[in-house]
UniProtKB/Swiss-Prot annotation:
Transmembrane segments: none annotated. It is an enzyme of class 6 (ligase). Belongs to the class-II aminoacyl-tRNA synthetase family. ProS type 2 subfamily. Its main location: cytoplasm. Its EC number is 6.1.1.15. This is Proline--tRNA ligase.
Length: 441
Protein backbone atom coordinates (compact mmCIF):
# COMPACT_ATOMS: atom_id res chain seq x y z
CA UNK A 1 0.00 0.00 0.00
CA UNK A 2 1.17 3.52 -0.84
CA UNK A 3 0.61 6.07 1.89
CA UNK A 4 -0.27 8.71 -0.72
CA UNK A 5 -3.32 6.57 -1.59
CA UNK A 6 -4.18 5.39 1.93
CA UNK A 7 -6.60 6.73 4.51
CA UNK A 8 -4.45 7.37 7.57
CA UNK A 9 -5.81 10.29 9.64
CA UNK A 10 -2.89 10.96 11.98
CA UNK A 11 -3.01 13.27 15.00
CA UNK A 12 0.10 15.28 15.89
CA UNK A 13 -0.93 16.08 19.46
CA UNK A 14 -1.91 13.74 22.27
CA UNK A 15 -5.72 13.67 22.61
CA UNK A 16 -6.86 15.09 25.95
CA UNK A 17 -9.40 12.32 26.48
CA UNK A 18 -6.78 9.56 26.23
CA UNK A 19 -5.83 8.36 29.72
CA UNK A 20 -3.62 5.39 28.82
CA UNK A 21 -0.90 4.69 26.27
CA UNK A 22 -2.90 2.42 23.97
CA UNK A 23 -5.82 4.85 23.70
CA UNK A 24 -3.43 7.71 22.94
CA UNK A 25 -1.48 5.88 20.25
CA UNK A 26 -4.53 4.27 18.64
CA UNK A 27 -6.10 7.71 18.20
CA UNK A 28 -2.87 9.37 17.05
CA UNK A 29 -2.07 6.55 14.59
CA UNK A 30 -5.51 6.80 13.01
CA UNK A 31 -6.53 3.30 14.08
CA UNK A 32 -9.86 4.20 15.70
CA UNK A 33 -12.31 7.06 16.07
CA UNK A 34 -14.71 7.51 18.97
CA UNK A 35 -18.32 7.83 17.78
CA UNK A 36 -19.90 8.19 21.23
CA UNK A 37 -19.02 7.18 24.76
CA UNK A 38 -17.36 3.75 24.67
CA UNK A 39 -18.17 3.10 20.99
CA UNK A 40 -15.52 3.26 18.26
CA UNK A 41 -15.14 3.00 14.52
CA UNK A 42 -12.15 0.96 13.40
CA UNK A 43 -10.28 2.80 10.64
CA UNK A 44 -8.15 1.04 7.97
CA UNK A 45 -4.93 0.68 9.98
CA UNK A 46 -6.76 -0.55 13.08
CA UNK A 47 -8.95 -2.89 11.04
CA UNK A 48 -5.87 -4.55 9.52
CA UNK A 49 -4.47 -5.27 12.98
CA UNK A 50 -7.85 -6.52 14.21
CA UNK A 51 -8.13 -8.83 11.19
CA UNK A 52 -4.65 -10.27 11.83
CA UNK A 53 -5.54 -10.99 15.45
CA UNK A 54 -8.80 -12.69 14.42
CA UNK A 55 -6.99 -14.76 11.78
CA UNK A 56 -4.61 -16.26 14.34
CA UNK A 57 -7.45 -16.83 16.81
CA UNK A 58 -9.42 -18.68 14.13
CA UNK A 59 -6.45 -20.83 13.14
CA UNK A 60 -5.82 -21.95 16.72
CA UNK A 61 -9.50 -22.52 17.48
CA UNK A 62 -9.84 -24.74 14.45
CA UNK A 63 -6.55 -26.52 15.20
CA UNK A 64 -8.12 -27.43 18.56
CA UNK A 65 -11.28 -28.72 16.87
CA UNK A 66 -13.66 -25.79 17.36
CA UNK A 67 -16.15 -25.07 14.55
CA UNK A 68 -17.07 -21.51 13.58
CA UNK A 69 -20.65 -20.25 13.51
CA UNK A 70 -22.09 -16.73 13.69
CA UNK A 71 -24.83 -15.81 16.14
CA UNK A 72 -26.76 -12.52 16.03
CA UNK A 73 -26.07 -9.56 18.27
CA UNK A 74 -29.77 -9.20 19.17
CA UNK A 75 -31.17 -11.99 21.36
CA UNK A 76 -34.60 -12.90 22.71
CA UNK A 77 -35.09 -12.15 26.40
CA UNK A 78 -37.05 -15.41 26.69
CA UNK A 79 -33.84 -17.46 26.45
CA UNK A 80 -32.29 -15.50 29.29
CA UNK A 81 -35.40 -15.90 31.42
CA UNK A 82 -35.20 -19.63 30.77
CA UNK A 83 -31.64 -19.81 32.13
CA UNK A 84 -32.50 -17.51 35.04
CA UNK A 85 -29.96 -14.84 34.10
CA UNK A 86 -32.25 -12.14 32.69
CA UNK A 87 -32.71 -10.40 36.04
CA UNK A 88 -29.20 -11.23 37.30
CA UNK A 89 -27.46 -9.14 34.67
CA UNK A 90 -28.48 -5.68 35.89
CA UNK A 91 -28.04 -2.44 33.98
CA UNK A 92 -24.98 -3.58 32.01
CA UNK A 93 -27.31 -5.44 29.65
CA UNK A 94 -29.02 -3.25 27.06
CA UNK A 95 -32.69 -4.23 26.99
CA UNK A 96 -34.87 -3.20 24.05
CA UNK A 97 -38.36 -3.85 22.66
CA UNK A 98 -39.31 -4.33 19.03
CA UNK A 99 -42.46 -2.90 17.44
CA UNK A 100 -44.41 -5.95 18.63
CA UNK A 101 -43.40 -5.09 22.22
CA UNK A 102 -41.30 -8.26 22.48
CA UNK A 103 -38.40 -8.09 24.93
CA UNK A 104 -35.00 -8.28 23.23
CA UNK A 105 -31.46 -7.56 24.33
CA UNK A 106 -28.10 -6.67 22.80
CA UNK A 107 -26.10 -9.73 23.78
CA UNK A 108 -23.30 -9.30 26.32
CA UNK A 109 -22.54 -13.04 25.94
CA UNK A 110 -24.04 -16.08 24.20
CA UNK A 111 -24.35 -19.07 26.55
CA UNK A 112 -28.14 -19.18 26.26
CA UNK A 113 -28.29 -18.83 22.49
CA UNK A 114 -25.65 -21.45 21.75
CA UNK A 115 -27.33 -23.86 24.19
CA UNK A 116 -30.60 -23.31 22.33
CA UNK A 117 -28.87 -24.10 19.03
CA UNK A 118 -27.34 -27.24 20.52
CA UNK A 119 -30.57 -28.61 22.01
CA UNK A 120 -32.42 -28.02 18.73
CA UNK A 121 -30.17 -30.34 16.73
CA UNK A 122 -27.96 -32.60 18.84
CA UNK A 123 -29.60 -35.76 20.18
CA UNK A 124 -26.92 -38.43 20.63
CA UNK A 125 -23.68 -38.92 22.52
CA UNK A 126 -22.21 -39.91 19.15
CA UNK A 127 -22.22 -36.22 18.17
CA UNK A 128 -20.03 -35.29 21.14
CA UNK A 129 -17.70 -33.69 21.98
CA UNK A 130 -18.73 -30.52 20.15
CA UNK A 131 -17.17 -27.06 20.33
CA UNK A 132 -18.82 -24.12 18.55
CA UNK A 133 -17.28 -20.65 18.39
CA UNK A 134 -18.00 -17.30 16.86
CA UNK A 135 -16.44 -13.84 16.61
CA UNK A 136 -19.05 -11.13 17.07
CA UNK A 137 -19.59 -7.66 18.49
CA UNK A 138 -20.94 -7.46 22.05
CA UNK A 139 -22.36 -4.64 24.13
CA UNK A 140 -22.17 -4.01 27.86
CA UNK A 141 -23.41 -0.69 29.16
CA UNK A 142 -20.44 0.16 31.38
CA UNK A 143 -21.13 2.85 33.98
CA UNK A 144 -17.92 4.61 33.04
CA UNK A 145 -16.39 3.43 29.77
CA UNK A 146 -12.77 4.54 29.62
CA UNK A 147 -9.32 3.67 28.33
CA UNK A 148 -10.43 3.54 24.68
CA UNK A 149 -11.13 0.03 23.37
CA UNK A 150 -9.65 -1.46 26.54
CA UNK A 151 -12.91 -0.88 28.40
CA UNK A 152 -15.43 0.02 25.71
CA UNK A 153 -19.18 -0.53 25.73
CA UNK A 154 -19.10 -2.21 22.32
CA UNK A 155 -16.31 -4.72 21.77
CA UNK A 156 -15.38 -7.68 19.59
CA UNK A 157 -15.32 -11.11 21.25
CA UNK A 158 -14.38 -14.62 20.28
CA UNK A 159 -16.58 -16.94 22.30
CA UNK A 160 -16.31 -20.73 22.14
CA UNK A 161 -18.70 -23.15 23.83
CA UNK A 162 -17.97 -26.83 24.47
CA UNK A 163 -20.53 -29.61 24.95
CA UNK A 164 -19.64 -33.00 26.44
CA UNK A 165 -21.47 -36.04 27.75
CA UNK A 166 -20.04 -35.79 31.26
CA UNK A 167 -17.74 -33.89 33.58
CA UNK A 168 -14.60 -35.80 32.57
CA UNK A 169 -15.19 -35.07 28.90
CA UNK A 170 -15.86 -31.40 29.55
CA UNK A 171 -12.69 -31.12 31.63
CA UNK A 172 -10.72 -32.41 28.63
CA UNK A 173 -12.44 -29.83 26.42
CA UNK A 174 -11.49 -27.17 28.98
CA UNK A 175 -7.86 -28.28 28.88
CA UNK A 176 -7.93 -28.30 25.08
CA UNK A 177 -8.99 -24.64 25.02
CA UNK A 178 -6.47 -23.82 27.76
CA UNK A 179 -3.67 -25.07 25.51
CA UNK A 180 -5.17 -23.38 22.44
CA UNK A 181 -5.09 -20.08 24.31
CA UNK A 182 -1.44 -20.54 25.25
CA UNK A 183 -0.64 -21.05 21.57
CA UNK A 184 -2.82 -18.15 20.43
CA UNK A 185 -1.14 -15.59 22.66
CA UNK A 186 2.31 -16.95 21.86
CA UNK A 187 1.68 -16.60 18.12
CA UNK A 188 0.54 -13.03 18.72
CA UNK A 189 3.91 -12.31 20.31
CA UNK A 190 2.53 -12.10 23.85
CA UNK A 191 3.52 -13.96 27.01
CA UNK A 192 0.26 -14.81 28.76
CA UNK A 193 0.16 -16.27 32.27
CA UNK A 194 -2.93 -18.33 33.24
CA UNK A 195 -4.33 -17.49 36.67
CA UNK A 196 -7.17 -18.98 38.70
CA UNK A 197 -10.12 -16.63 38.47
CA UNK A 198 -13.52 -15.88 39.92
CA UNK A 199 -16.32 -17.22 37.72
CA UNK A 200 -18.48 -14.11 38.17
CA UNK A 201 -21.90 -13.94 36.43
CA UNK A 202 -20.91 -16.68 33.95
CA UNK A 203 -20.94 -19.20 36.79
CA UNK A 204 -19.27 -22.54 37.42
CA UNK A 205 -16.51 -23.74 39.73
CA UNK A 206 -13.43 -23.64 37.49
CA UNK A 207 -12.05 -20.64 35.66
CA UNK A 208 -8.73 -19.20 34.46
CA UNK A 209 -7.94 -15.79 33.10
CA UNK A 210 -4.92 -15.18 30.90
CA UNK A 211 -2.86 -12.13 31.86
CA UNK A 212 -0.07 -10.42 29.93
CA UNK A 213 2.48 -8.31 31.78
CA UNK A 214 2.33 -4.56 31.15
CA UNK A 215 3.61 -1.70 33.30
CA UNK A 216 0.37 0.18 32.65
CA UNK A 217 -1.81 -2.87 33.35
CA UNK A 218 -5.12 -2.48 35.16
CA UNK A 219 -4.56 -5.36 37.60
CA UNK A 220 -1.93 -6.14 40.20
CA UNK A 221 -0.64 -9.69 39.68
CA UNK A 222 1.51 -12.02 41.74
CA UNK A 223 3.23 -15.03 40.22
CA UNK A 224 6.22 -17.32 40.23
CA UNK A 225 8.98 -16.14 37.88
CA UNK A 226 9.29 -19.69 36.57
CA UNK A 227 6.27 -18.93 34.37
CA UNK A 228 8.51 -16.73 32.25
CA UNK A 229 10.70 -19.74 31.39
CA UNK A 230 7.91 -22.14 30.39
CA UNK A 231 7.73 -23.04 26.71
CA UNK A 232 4.44 -23.00 24.83
CA UNK A 233 3.46 -26.21 22.95
CA UNK A 234 4.37 -26.05 19.27
CA UNK A 235 2.10 -26.70 16.30
CA UNK A 236 2.73 -30.45 16.44
CA UNK A 237 0.80 -30.89 19.70
CA UNK A 238 -1.92 -33.52 19.43
CA UNK A 239 -5.16 -31.94 20.66
CA UNK A 240 -6.83 -35.35 20.68
CA UNK A 241 -4.32 -36.75 23.20
CA UNK A 242 -5.89 -36.32 26.64
CA UNK A 243 -2.68 -37.18 28.49
CA UNK A 244 -0.68 -34.56 26.60
CA UNK A 245 -3.32 -31.91 27.29
CA UNK A 246 -3.51 -32.84 30.98
CA UNK A 247 0.28 -32.72 31.36
CA UNK A 248 0.51 -29.34 29.64
CA UNK A 249 -2.20 -27.78 31.81
CA UNK A 250 -0.65 -29.31 34.93
CA UNK A 251 2.71 -27.77 34.04
CA UNK A 252 1.16 -24.34 33.46
CA UNK A 253 -0.89 -24.41 36.67
CA UNK A 254 1.69 -25.88 39.04
CA UNK A 255 3.26 -22.51 39.94
CA UNK A 256 1.66 -19.77 41.98
CA UNK A 257 -0.20 -17.12 39.98
CA UNK A 258 -3.02 -14.84 41.10
CA UNK A 259 -4.59 -11.47 40.52
CA UNK A 260 -5.10 -9.18 43.50
CA UNK A 261 -8.67 -10.47 43.95
CA UNK A 262 -7.52 -14.11 44.26
CA UNK A 263 -4.16 -13.45 45.95
CA UNK A 264 -3.30 -15.67 48.93
CA UNK A 265 -0.60 -14.22 51.18
CA UNK A 266 0.16 -17.56 52.84
CA UNK A 267 0.88 -19.29 49.53
CA UNK A 268 2.82 -16.25 48.32
CA UNK A 269 4.99 -16.31 51.45
CA UNK A 270 5.98 -19.91 50.72
CA UNK A 271 7.68 -18.78 47.50
CA UNK A 272 11.38 -17.96 47.69
CA UNK A 273 12.09 -14.24 47.42
CA UNK A 274 13.98 -14.62 44.14
CA UNK A 275 11.03 -16.39 42.51
CA UNK A 276 8.42 -13.78 43.38
CA UNK A 277 7.16 -11.53 40.61
CA UNK A 278 4.83 -8.72 41.60
CA UNK A 279 3.76 -6.66 38.61
CA UNK A 280 0.89 -5.16 36.63
CA UNK A 281 -1.06 -7.08 34.02
CA UNK A 282 -3.95 -7.00 31.57
CA UNK A 283 -6.55 -9.74 31.14
CA UNK A 284 -6.68 -10.89 27.51
CA UNK A 285 -8.64 -14.13 27.80
CA UNK A 286 -10.98 -15.94 30.20
CA UNK A 287 -12.15 -19.56 30.19
CA UNK A 288 -14.90 -21.16 32.28
CA UNK A 289 -16.05 -24.66 33.11
CA UNK A 290 -19.63 -24.44 34.37
CA UNK A 291 -20.97 -27.96 33.90
CA UNK A 292 -24.78 -28.00 33.73
CA UNK A 293 -25.48 -24.38 34.81
CA UNK A 294 -27.17 -23.62 31.47
CA UNK A 295 -27.84 -27.06 30.02
CA UNK A 296 -29.94 -28.22 33.01
CA UNK A 297 -32.51 -25.38 33.12
CA UNK A 298 -32.62 -25.27 29.31
CA UNK A 299 -32.87 -29.08 29.05
CA UNK A 300 -29.95 -29.57 26.68
CA UNK A 301 -29.76 -33.37 26.76
CA UNK A 302 -28.44 -36.21 24.63
CA UNK A 303 -29.14 -39.92 24.62
CA UNK A 304 -26.20 -41.77 26.13
CA UNK A 305 -24.76 -45.14 25.23
CA UNK A 306 -26.73 -46.54 28.18
CA UNK A 307 -30.02 -45.54 26.53
CA UNK A 308 -30.68 -42.81 29.08
CA UNK A 309 -30.86 -39.04 28.65
CA UNK A 310 -27.88 -37.07 29.96
CA UNK A 311 -27.69 -33.32 30.59
CA UNK A 312 -24.57 -32.17 28.76
CA UNK A 313 -21.62 -30.58 30.56
CA UNK A 314 -20.43 -27.25 29.17
CA UNK A 315 -17.63 -24.69 29.16
CA UNK A 316 -17.13 -21.28 27.58
CA UNK A 317 -13.95 -19.62 26.38
CA UNK A 318 -13.53 -15.93 25.58
CA UNK A 319 -10.90 -13.75 23.94
CA UNK A 320 -11.55 -10.09 23.13
CA UNK A 321 -9.71 -9.27 19.87
CA UNK A 322 -10.45 -5.54 20.12
CA UNK A 323 -9.19 -5.42 23.71
CA UNK A 324 -6.21 -7.57 22.73
CA UNK A 325 -5.04 -4.95 20.21
CA UNK A 326 -4.93 -2.33 22.96
CA UNK A 327 -3.28 -4.73 25.41
CA UNK A 328 -0.49 -5.47 22.93
CA UNK A 329 0.23 -1.75 22.64
CA UNK A 330 0.31 -1.38 26.43
CA UNK A 331 2.83 -4.22 26.57
CA UNK A 332 5.02 -3.00 23.68
CA UNK A 333 5.61 0.70 23.00
CA UNK A 334 8.03 3.55 23.59
CA UNK A 335 7.72 7.33 23.69
CA UNK A 336 7.62 7.50 19.87
CA UNK A 337 4.75 5.10 19.34
CA UNK A 338 3.68 1.49 18.97
CA UNK A 339 6.09 -1.45 18.62
CA UNK A 340 4.05 -4.24 17.05
CA UNK A 341 4.92 -7.93 17.32
CA UNK A 342 5.49 -9.09 13.73
CA UNK A 343 2.37 -11.25 13.72
CA UNK A 344 0.13 -8.28 14.60
CA UNK A 345 1.74 -5.52 12.53
CA UNK A 346 -0.66 -3.95 9.99
CA UNK A 347 2.06 -4.16 7.31
CA UNK A 348 5.15 -6.35 7.08
CA UNK A 349 7.64 -3.64 6.14
CA UNK A 350 7.66 0.15 5.98
CA UNK A 351 9.54 1.79 3.10
CA UNK A 352 10.48 5.46 3.52
CA UNK A 353 11.29 7.44 0.38
CA UNK A 354 13.19 10.36 1.86
CA UNK A 355 13.24 12.29 -1.43
CA UNK A 356 10.40 11.37 -3.84
CA UNK A 357 11.63 13.88 -6.45
CA UNK A 358 14.96 12.04 -6.67
CA UNK A 359 14.72 9.58 -9.56
CA UNK A 360 17.15 7.03 -8.08
CA UNK A 361 15.38 7.05 -4.70
CA UNK A 362 12.01 6.52 -6.34
CA UNK A 363 13.31 3.77 -8.62
CA UNK A 364 14.82 1.92 -5.65
CA UNK A 365 11.60 2.28 -3.64
CA UNK A 366 9.52 0.95 -6.52
CA UNK A 367 11.91 -1.97 -7.00
CA UNK A 368 11.72 -2.89 -3.29
CA UNK A 369 7.98 -2.29 -3.02
CA UNK A 370 7.12 -4.48 -5.99
CA UNK A 371 9.69 -7.11 -5.06
CA UNK A 372 8.28 -7.48 -1.56
CA UNK A 373 4.74 -7.73 -2.92
CA UNK A 374 5.81 -10.38 -5.43
CA UNK A 375 7.44 -12.32 -2.57
CA UNK A 376 4.11 -12.42 -0.72
CA UNK A 377 4.71 -9.59 1.74
CA UNK A 378 2.50 -6.60 2.47
CA UNK A 379 4.75 -3.50 2.32
CA UNK A 380 3.80 0.08 3.21
CA UNK A 381 5.48 2.78 1.11
CA UNK A 382 5.60 6.34 2.38
CA UNK A 383 5.79 8.13 -0.97
CA UNK A 384 4.41 11.47 0.27
CA UNK A 385 6.18 14.72 -0.52
CA UNK A 386 6.84 15.44 3.16
CA UNK A 387 9.89 16.21 5.30
CA UNK A 388 12.00 13.14 6.21
CA UNK A 389 11.46 13.89 9.91
CA UNK A 390 7.71 13.69 9.46
CA UNK A 391 8.05 10.36 7.67
CA UNK A 392 10.28 8.91 10.39
CA UNK A 393 7.80 10.04 13.05
CA UNK A 394 4.89 8.46 11.17
CA UNK A 395 6.67 5.15 10.73
CA UNK A 396 7.71 5.04 14.40
CA UNK A 397 4.19 5.94 15.52
CA UNK A 398 2.44 3.17 13.57
CA UNK A 399 5.04 0.68 14.78
CA UNK A 400 5.96 -1.48 11.78
CA UNK A 401 8.72 -3.89 12.93
CA UNK A 402 11.15 -3.19 10.08
CA UNK A 403 11.77 0.08 8.25
CA UNK A 404 13.59 0.40 4.93
CA UNK A 405 15.00 3.92 4.57
CA UNK A 406 15.87 5.07 1.05
CA UNK A 407 17.77 8.36 0.84
CA UNK A 408 19.93 10.07 -1.81
CA UNK A 409 23.20 9.67 0.11
CA UNK A 410 22.88 5.93 0.63
CA UNK A 411 21.36 5.22 -2.77
CA UNK A 412 24.37 6.90 -4.37
CA UNK A 413 26.29 3.86 -3.09
CA UNK A 414 23.44 1.52 -4.15
CA UNK A 415 22.53 0.99 -0.49
CA UNK A 416 19.53 1.44 1.78
CA UNK A 417 19.27 1.50 5.55
CA UNK A 418 17.32 -1.15 7.48
CA UNK A 419 16.02 -0.13 10.91
CA UNK A 420 14.62 -2.43 13.57
CA UNK A 421 11.76 -0.57 15.26
CA UNK A 422 12.09 -2.42 18.57
CA UNK A 423 15.83 -2.08 19.13
CA UNK A 424 16.55 0.95 16.95
CA UNK A 425 19.47 -0.96 15.41
CA UNK A 426 20.37 0.04 11.85
CA UNK A 427 22.36 -1.61 9.11
CA UNK A 428 23.09 -0.89 5.47
CA UNK A 429 22.35 -3.33 2.67
CA UNK A 430 22.89 -3.30 -1.05
CA UNK A 431 19.59 -2.74 -2.84
CA UNK A 432 19.84 -6.07 -4.63
CA UNK A 433 20.37 -7.91 -1.29
CA UNK A 434 17.41 -6.42 0.56
CA UNK A 435 14.74 -8.85 -0.63
CA UNK A 436 16.75 -11.96 0.19
CA UNK A 437 17.79 -10.61 3.60
CA UNK A 438 14.32 -9.48 4.64
CA UNK A 439 12.76 -12.75 3.54
CA UNK A 440 14.61 -14.58 6.30
CA UNK A 441 13.70 -12.15 9.11
Amino acid sequence: MRLSQYFLPLLKENPKEAEIVSHRFMLRAGMIRQQTSGIYSWLPLGKKVLDKVCKIIREEQERAGAIEILMPTIQSADLWRESGRYDDYGLEMLRIKDRQKRDLLYGPTNEEMVTDIFRSYVRSYKDLPLNLYHIQWKFRDEIRPRFGVMRAREFLMKDAYSFDLDYEGSKTSYNRMFVAYLRTFSRLGLKAIPMRADTGPIGGKLSHEFIILAETGESAIFCDKQFLELSVPNSSIDFSDKAVLDDTVKQWTSFYAATEEMHNEEEWARLSEENRLSARGIEVGHIFHFGTKYSAPMEAKVMGQDGKEHVVSMGSYGIGPSRLVAAAIEASHDEKGIIWPKSMAPFDFGIINMKPDDEKCTQACEFLYQGLKDAGFDPFLDDRNERPGSKFATMDLIGLPTQIIVGPNSIAHNEVEIKDRKTGAKKSLKVEDVLSQLSIL
